[in-house]
Amino acid sequence: MFNGTFSGNLMGFLYFTLFIVSGVFISNNLFKKLSFLTRIFLGTVTGTVLLMWLPVMVSFILGFNVLSHIIAFVLLLGLDVLSVFLAKKPKLTSFNFSFSKDDLFTLIPVLIMTVFYGIVEASHIMQPSETGGMIFGQSTYADVHIHLSFITAPIKQGTVPFYYNIAPENQVSYPFLSDTVSSSIYIFGASLRWSYIIPTIMGAFNVYLGAFMFFRLWLKKFSKALIAFILFAFNGGFGFMYFFDNLRINEDNFTRIFEKLYETPTNLDGNMIRWVNTFCDMMIPQRATLFGWMMLFAILYLLYRAVFLKENDKYIYAGVLAGLTPLISTHIFLAVGIISAVWMLSRLYLMAKFKPKYAFYIALALVVLGGIIFIATCIKTGDSIMNVDYDQAGMNVLGAVGIIIALIYASLILINLFNGKFKEIFFSWGIYLIIVLALAMPQLIKFTFGQAQGEGFLEPHFNWINSKDSYFWFYVKNMGVPALLIIPALFNASKRNLSVVAPIAVLMLLAETFSLQPNVYDNNKIIYPAFFLAIGVIADYMVSVYEKLKGIKGREILATTVIIACVLSGVLSMGREYVADEYEMFSSPQVQVAAWVDENTEDDAVFLTNDRYNNAITGLTGRSVVCGGGWFFSTHGLPNHSQLQNDVRQMYADPENSKVLFEKHRVDYIVVGPDEKGSYTVNEDAIKNIADMVYNENGIQVYKLK
């Protein structure tokens, strides 16, 4: 049952731990020359990725069950042995525990943030209420149900791929490995709550450590890496100003941050504050984003060493991680693809021995061309500024600039091949690309491409989520000080740093002209990787300015003021999230009926319920319902919600004449409770004629069809 047992918790945690330890063992063998902390980072990422992938790979053949997980563990041991032989000097005991002062000062903020994450995550997931219900947090309330269903459903269905239990006819093409990593703990009898929480804490540790290690590698100076880490962990703009307005007259304007639902300095929809804090609204509620960022920073770390430090063996490891990313986070796979493509373009340009200043002129020409195309399209499609097809204008810019970049790409490849650079290209980017495509294409073909054909995916859309503010003001007030510093930071940046951050332009162009999924807000999953690159060069600039002010009185006060302005909105939002464990998503009667369902019904049973957003039967038990919440249908591109609603309504209102519908949807049980009675006309007398009551507690009845 979803409450788990002591032995189940122990087995699940042991299984998880063995994968993490094996990942560190493999990392130690493959990356002997790197620091101990780096090997820990790459090792915990490796262990997490192997826990995501090995059980699922075996489950494609044998089904999602304990046997598959045992075989996956045997394969893990095989990889451990293989890593020993791949090591340049294979010694099972060759562990270098060297720890620098910078490593220690890196771990301190990383561990503080990880512990804070664990505390908030634990308070936000399935906390028992005083009445026997389950409490969730502000940020997890909207997303957690679908994640719970993705954890429980594959175990009950016993298959991979598995199907949405809120829409049983539809295969899950969402990047589900971020959830089945918890299924691989839950399957041993662990509690659903701890199965959910444990991998996310490791994911948060990897994100924070990965971000810091990448910034240290790139920016070289610890102080710059620390500033970049702070900007990442506590991001926020000028949203705090909305809460300090008229504070003397109305104190409630400030305290509402900690009392109201989603009225924070980083998430205030009515005032167009949509640049949410990385901790509160991304890492806590969004598992695909959390584990996607884990992959992103590991790949960036390895790829940076390969591209800019010329460590060609890192192309192999970066390629493996990138190729395994689509079913962890499709958005991050796309972002990694764009970053890789732009970094490769910069390398090809330098290999062709063109002067770096010409790259600036080319970039400037593309900006001017894009502006001309945008303005020309606006003039052509509208008779006033309020009647312009901005979506089409953005698409035209994306298309034109994309074609030109592709032509430049092809030209540089041909020039380098003509100059005898084939071997150099093949044994670097060529190997990387082959590995990525070999691993990623089966995932994309089997899952991603099919889902992307659904309604609302890949459509023209200009100006992201901004519907009220002028274009630049929207980003200034949302991103705050970093938005004001990005231009001077770029002008101050070294040639190498400009190459590192060049992908920002392509990432932002795509995110600002295209809706990648039905919920355009989720384009922020492409914008955040651009932001991570931007804060690196901004941190570099901030420290440089501070050093140039040496000897000037008040520079410490100025620096402190700037940092406070950078993080105040984020800190206040995180404070709100810390106390936001107050929302009962499942009532005590709902939890009790879910417990009965989990213990007394078939794993493949289908239930007729109303289409409520948060359904304890689908979330806690993994069983299927005829029709789940409409919001999930919309954001996941699932079809026929209206038709399914009509079928459900018909079966409740006239069950005796709905035999065809009951058979069509393979209904086994009918639930009648306050939710159903509040949503439909429920003919309970007729239901009793076709089904037997098997549960009747707390105003909820469950009937089994005869």
Model segments located where?
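Start-transfer (signal-anchor) and selected internal transmembrane alpha helices
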Residues: 66-130, 222, 226, 414-417
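Hydrophobic, aromatic-rich transmembrane alpha-helices
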Residues: 298-306, 339-351, 403-420, 478-498, ...
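Active-site lumenal/periplasmic loops and adjacent helix-entry segments of GT-C-fold
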Residues: 5, 113-295, 330-334, 583-584, ...
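Membrane-interface alpha helices of multi-pass inner-membrane proteins
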Residues: 280-282, 315-330
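Membrane-embedded, hydrophobic transmembrane alpha-helices
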Residues: 1-103, 350, 359-365, 384-403
